[in-house]
Amino acid sequence: MSQSTIKFDLGELTTTQCARLLSKFIRKATLTPEQFEILNTSYDELTEFDDHPLYGGATDHHKDIVGKYDHALLKPAVYQQLRDFATKMESSSWQQTEIDAESDIPTWEQISENERDCVRKVLAFFAVGDTLVKDRIAIFADEFPLPECKDFIDWQTVNEGVHQRVYNNYLDALVKDKIYLADLVNAYKDPEFAPIKKKVDWLGKIISVENDSRGEMVVGQVCTEAIMFAASFAILLKFRAPYMRALVLGNEFIRRDETLHFRFYAELLRLMPDRPSDERIAELLTEATEIELEFAEYVVPEGVKYITKDRLIQHVKANTNQVCEMLDINPIYFDQKGNVLLSPLLYMNTLESEQKINFFEGKATEYNTKQYKVDFNNLFPPVKKMIEFADEEEFIAAIVEGEGLSKDRNKDIVKQQLCLAWDHLSSHDMEGLVDMTWTLKDVHRIAMNHVIFNNGEFSNGYKFTVIDSGKVMYPTYETVEILESAVQGLIDDYNRDFSALDKGVEKFDKDKIRVAARFILDLLYIHPFSDGNGRTARLIMAHLIGKMTTPINREEYLKSIYHYRQTGDVSVFVDQFYR
């Protein structure tokens, strides 16, 4: 390079660009005094905190600054909490081969085209988004050279690669038109798919070597992990209802991973001496949220059975409020009364998704094999009535159903599953009607998950309840198909009777309760499941009558059931739900 004066306006460059020019040209170019001063000032700004331990400065354990290969020695850690994140990620590692995407094809072919279109767009964004993240996180290995940081980032890189392959497997299995698939995956470059393009563009801009703020890049990564995927996870995990098991299981794993990624970068942000101001962090969170809201509006068409736009939008905003809480800044979104906005989606109630257990399989998606326990004091959102309902329902199940809750069972699991089952019932307006799958089998599948092995499945076996040292027998059926036909007959009778009610008369509520009670009592008589019939019936009854309560007096509850069997009178049973 010739020793000529550099021809550019240094005042228009970012500090990062100035520092690069300094390192590249300082010994090869002739600088004017003014140019040298600008470069020198920029360099001082960038290196102001370079002696901080987080950026590789000397510590009591490391007498010298961190060198290029010092991460070969992982101990002692300067920040043990960051090392713990890496250890946790290692212990949670999994492989794409654990997810059989093709097993969902039969269900995929049964859902509506609107639902398929919604899922395709979400999967396409995830495939691109995870690729982008994997490509960009190397930046943080340079910015945070500590061994514990590099260790986590190494694991995250592998982790994101697994995510990328899983989403590609989903797309390959579920989208047979490969030309359309190519267009979908390239949507981030097409203005026609503006919300997807805007998300990818924003992420590419904020997490970039051209960004002159190390702190803003970390906030951008926080937004990526905790906000930019919020609507997508809420959509895909809702498809547990039609039993797309591979789709749900894979996204439970991935959401768990992204939660850990978020917590790592949130902790990194907390430790940074040059952390952006709370106001600037809030600005970036708001930018990311508004882009995610556009995506939520775009990706969910009308007529998608399991998702509504208004609930999804509220969830995205509430999710950002929780991110604010975990970053120790003020919430951003409020309702019309000035209260902090909370998520209406209980199944997405916490960023701590490591607490979740998969809905379908015996394999847990939490990080280790320690006994699963939920901190209900920190449940998000704190729906007090729902938790009270679950407390009462867990209690009545224990005293009425006996062996359904053994002493060895973790009751917190039961309580969480009851909350999830209630949210499932509440998340779609069936207009008072009952559906074999949605209302009955799904509720039992969720409520009894990890309590019995055949949750959600009818059992035509020998069933009885022990009451006062005596056995109460239930009908037996030669085959499950005959049993299912009997239950379907009850459902058809209920739907017919409910539809015939005059909704305009004053006594409609009383008539509705009477019809619902008769259906529930007849269902209890048939006893279609091997266990958990009472729990399931009480959840459905509370939903049908619109009152979140459950009976808690064992003797009176049982008497009301037998009173109906002897007299056909439902009033005593109804009274159990109106105390």
From Swiss-Prot:
Per the record's keyword annotation, is Magnesium included, yes or no?
Answer: no
* Matching PROSITE patterns: FIDO (PS51459)
Known catalytic reactions? a 2'-deoxyribonucleoside 5'-diphosphate + [thioredoxin]-disulfide + H2O = a ribonucleoside 5'-diphosphate + [thioredoxin]-dithiol
Q: What are the protein's UniProt keywords? A: Deoxyribonucleotide synthesis, Iron, Metal-binding, Oxidoreductase
Cofactor(s) for this UniProt protein = Fe cation
The residues that hold Fe cation 1 are 130, 160, 163
Output the GO biological process annotations, alphabetical, semicolon-separated: deoxyribonucleotide biosynthetic process
Q: Where is the active site?
A: 167
GO molecular function, one example? metal ion binding
What protein name applies here?
Ribonucleoside-diphosphate reductase small chain
Q: Which organism does this sequence originate in?
A: Ostreid herpesvirus 1 (isolate France)
Taxonomic lineage of this organism? Answer: Viruses, Duplodnaviria, Heunggongvirae, Peploviricota, Herviviricetes
